[in-house]
Amino acid sequence: MCAASVYPVSPEAAKHSLTDEAAYRAMYQQSVINPEGFWREQAARLDWIRPFSEVKRTSFDDHHVDIKWFADGTLNVSANCLDRHLAERGDQVAIIWEGDDPSEHREITYRELYQEVCKFANALRGQDVHRGDVVTIYMPMIPEAAVAMLACARIGAIHSVVFGGFSPEALAGRIIDGSSKVVITADQGIRGGKTIALKENVDEALTNPQTRCVQKIIVVRRTGANIRWYPHRDVSYDDLMRVAGEVCAPKEMGAEEPLFILYTSGSTGKPKGVLHTCGGYLLYAALTHERVFDYRPGDIYWCTADIGWITGHSYLIYGPLANGATTLMYEGVPNYPDVTRIARIIDKHRVNILYTAPTAIRAMMAEGPAAMEGADGSSLRLLGTVGEPINPEAWHWYYETVGRSRCPIVDTWWQTETGGILISPLPGATALKPGSATRPLFGVVPGLVDNLGNLLEGPAEGNLVILDSWPGQMRTIYGDHDRFVDTYFKTFRGMYFTGDGARRDEDGYYWITGRVDDVLNVSGHRMGTAEIESALVAHAKVAEAAAVGVPHPLKGQAIYVYVTLVAGTEPSDTLRQELQQWVRHEIGPIAVPDTIQWAPGLPKTRSGKIMRRLLRKIATDDYDTLGDTSTLADPGVVDQLIAAHEAVKQR
């Protein structure tokens, strides 16, 4: 193995972990040579109502993309996360909830969670929610959000969780796309000492006439604030729970019936409703949670992700609960009330496993030793990172300062579409290289291809594809299977195209190099450039806009936007701020451009295509490698943009 900055597996980790190097190699070989046999064996970790006869029926042929796992088997996801644990661990804590305010926390046992879920499942049925209906969940990070997800799964409703930071317009778009019957929300959310007007946002979203599909809003009281109330439509969560029956038999669901829709940004503007199903998704989330995090009974496991993202679905709720784990849910932000909050939570709850994003790590790192000041940290055994590639400097700081140079780091690569982690170290099996996601997990066959789709052998750099299906894979884009095929299977025929670029080194380790399509990764959140551009162009004073990502020390990428104004409109700092507020209103705070540069025009080919490559280079001061600009309709615009960029830097 190449010796540059390699951290070998410690003898202790190899001895005590679930998977050592020999076990990894044997399991991986079986999983790719005999996937049917491997996944049949693994599926025994779930409780099936009707056992399946066929394991795998999948095709990546772009004329007939079809993904089915355990298709004739039946089960219930909620029962697998709750009911089956009651006999042995009913009194074990399932969810530790830590409030935004450090003085607030709750512990909910498996039995208590089961009771709450049964009652709320009955309450949903009382609101005419049934199998196959879509329920939108727009909530803060409170236990009731987990209850809502599991209650939907119990009765066969499809949940669609929308991140609480999204604007009313973005929320409305997701409600309309899924034809949601019910919206579950809270009066307000609390993050970093500030309140978020969730109910007010829902009210505003439902002023869109296309949201008439919504029959009821169920409102959880989080702050007790005065909110507008519409008696014909709004229902109190507490009132429903007060009268709900306590017994709710789990619905027998086909393995391929939908479990949830989760919207993710695409390169074409309209967010994609990624659809995951019951059987394969839960199995993959449970297996990867156990093996990647080397989960052992009794561990306190903390995934810092919001439930509005796939990481919150798979590794805060479904994976841990399917494995009978104790999962910690945190309402707030990493630096509130001060930078020691993460360290304090680790010590307060004796956290053993921490799974967080490079953005949070870089924010702590920026504070220097203060972030871990006075912390004990001795309970930690394993660290994880997710959302974007972690730069080696942040990796080293995380390893040395948070993990005290004794906790392995699992740098995980995966996507909303994959349902679970695809490439990651295993603590007892994989020597670590800072910045590398290392090797594929069981059943995952990655490849690198050039732009013509030719597979590259050995050490190489190219487009990252997956050559065969795995159980956690998304099945379709909700209501738009053609878009699913076009997005993931048409670029490179017979392969799943991830949209990411990667490098494979001489040891077979994978290094993710970032998106190769027009998608940004801001603080670990994917965002389509087209979505931001569409929002800006909807403003009366904007003629054209182009968004690119530029490196940012904390967020990974910052949003840099070139804006061409309507003729006769004068650029000004006031207008710049107005446009930033406009994007905040249209999409949400996470999409607000960090920099807006006024542009006399955009570099376009004669066919009208914007040359984003040039815009990225100008935004990062890379003027020397602009390459041939003679194919542009107006080559002179490049010099104008460079001059304008220099002016932006002087501001």
UniProtKB/Swiss-Prot annotation:
GO terms for cellular component: cytosol. One of its GO terms (biological process) is acetyl-CoA biosynthetic process from acetate. The keyword Metal-binding applies. Pfam families: ACAS_N (PF16177), AMP-binding (PF00501), AMP-binding_C (PF13193). It catalyses: acetate + ATP + CoA = acetyl-CoA + AMP + diphosphate. Its cofactor is Mg(2+). Mg(2+) binds at residues 537, 539, 542. Acetylated. Deacetylation by the SIR2-homolog deacetylase activates the enzyme. The modification N6-acetyllysine is found at residue 609. Keywords: Acetylation, ATP-binding, Ligase, Magnesium, Metal-binding, Nucleotide-binding. ATP binds at residues 387-389, 411-416, 500, 515, 526. Signal peptide: none annotated. CoA binds at residues 191-194, 311, 335, 523, 584. Its EC number is 6.2.1.1. Belongs to the ATP-dependent AMP-binding enzyme family. Catalyzes the conversion of acetate into acetyl-CoA (AcCoA), an essential intermediate at the junction of anabolic and catabolic pathways. AcsA undergoes a two-step reaction. In the first half reaction, AcsA combines acetate with ATP to form acetyl-adenylate (AcAMP) intermediate. In the second half reaction, it can then transfer the acetyl group from AcAMP to the sulfhydryl group of CoA, forming the product AcCoA. This is Acetyl-coenzyme A synthetase. It comes from Stutzerimonas stutzeri (strain A1501) (Pseudomonas stutzeri).
